[in-house]
């Protein structure tokens, strides 16, 4: 499967039909052939979700922590043949969700006692830059297993330790890391459209050997960890940008899991 078959174009995202057997998560990514640099992960996140939804016949999609910035508008979701339900723990964030989208308020790492919880109610669950803020990620994965229908798929996209840039964010006091991020990215100031939340990085790693046993304990029949290296935090710092890029290119070439910067962690629930 080429990325052309997963393309979202212009104001009208569209998934072009492909005639392929269901296959496995690994074979899906083998055919897509992601680049090593994390820019690919950012650029192709929506297309990857649509590709997975198409390949595995997934229609009812829950976006975890999507409150203020949902994956698609209602029109985009409809055009791509999916029913999008936006989840968040915070009612204030859900109040910012686009018009027409369904919402579900519950804590993905909680006890799933909230009225909006629908066990086995989703064909797919996705999240982008959420899991690094979750306290209790292993429980979150167990809950995802409960919330997915048989054969359902989940994808979590998050930053990973111990990439130096995120290791620094992890060890610095929150007040200091806030100040650094606000200086580099003014749009992420408090009250803006993309505020910075405290990051815990629980189970946010890019090492398949570390993650897969935990995901199997959560009950998943199939797992895939797509690793990425590189980032854009030094783009406005000539010299440092080039050194960092060379470091990450080398790490990607040798497959150094310890310093991945981002990962797509993708799981599939058994059909039984």
Give, region by region, the residue ranges found by the protein language model.
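Active-site micro-motifs of SAM-dependent methyltransferase domains
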Residues: 108-110, 132, 163
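A short SAM/SAH-binding and catalytic strip from SAM-dependent methyltransferases
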Residues: 124-136
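Helix-to-beta-strand junctions that scaffold the AdoMet/dcAdoMet cofactor pocket
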Residues: 134-135, 148-150
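S-adenosyl-L-methionine-dependent methyltransferase catalytic module, highlighting the catalytic core
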Residues: 138-139, 143, 153-265
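Conserved N-terminal segment of class I S-adenosyl-L-methionine
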Residues: 2-120, 124, 260-263, 271
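Surface-exposed cleft-lining segments at the edges of enzyme active sites
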Residues: 32-36, 128, 196-202
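Short glycine-/acidic-enriched loop or helix-start segments at secondary-structure transitions
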Residues: 72-74, 96, 136-137, 145, ...
């Amino acid at each position: 499967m080429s990325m052309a078959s997963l393309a979202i174009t212009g104001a009208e995202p569209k998934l072009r039909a492909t005639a392929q057997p269901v296959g496995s998560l690994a074979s899906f990514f083998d055919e897509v052939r992601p680049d090593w640099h994390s820019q690919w992960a950012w650029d192709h996140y929506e297309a990857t979700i649509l590709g997975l939804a198409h390949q595995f016949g997934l229609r009812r999609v829950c976006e975890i922590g999507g409150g203020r910035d949902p994956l698609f508008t209602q029109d985009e979701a409809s055009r791509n043949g999916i029913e999008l339900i936006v989840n968040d723990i915070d009612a204030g964030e859900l109040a910012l969700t686009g018009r027409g989208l369904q919402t579900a308020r519950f804590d993905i790492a909680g006890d799933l006692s909230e009225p909006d919880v629908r066990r086995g109610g989703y064909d797919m669950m996705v999240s982008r830059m959420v899991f690094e803020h979750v306290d209790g990620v292993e429980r979150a994965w167990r809950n995802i297993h409960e919330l997915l229908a048989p054969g359902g798929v989940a994808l979590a996209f998050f930053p990973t330790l111990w990439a130096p840039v995120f290791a620094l964010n992890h060890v610095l006091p929150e007040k200091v890391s806030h100040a650094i991020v606000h200086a580099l990215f003014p749009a992420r100031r408090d009250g803006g459209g993309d505020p910075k939340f405290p990051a815990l990085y629980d189970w946010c790693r890019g090492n398949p050997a570390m993650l897969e046993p935990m995901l199997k304990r959560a009950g998943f029949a199939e797992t895939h960890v797509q690793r990425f290296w590189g980032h854009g935090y030094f783009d406005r710092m000539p010299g440092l940008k080039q050194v960092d890029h060379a470091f990450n290119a080398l790490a990607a070439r040798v497959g150094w899991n310890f310093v991945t910067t981002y990962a797509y962690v993708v799981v599939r629930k058994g059909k039984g």
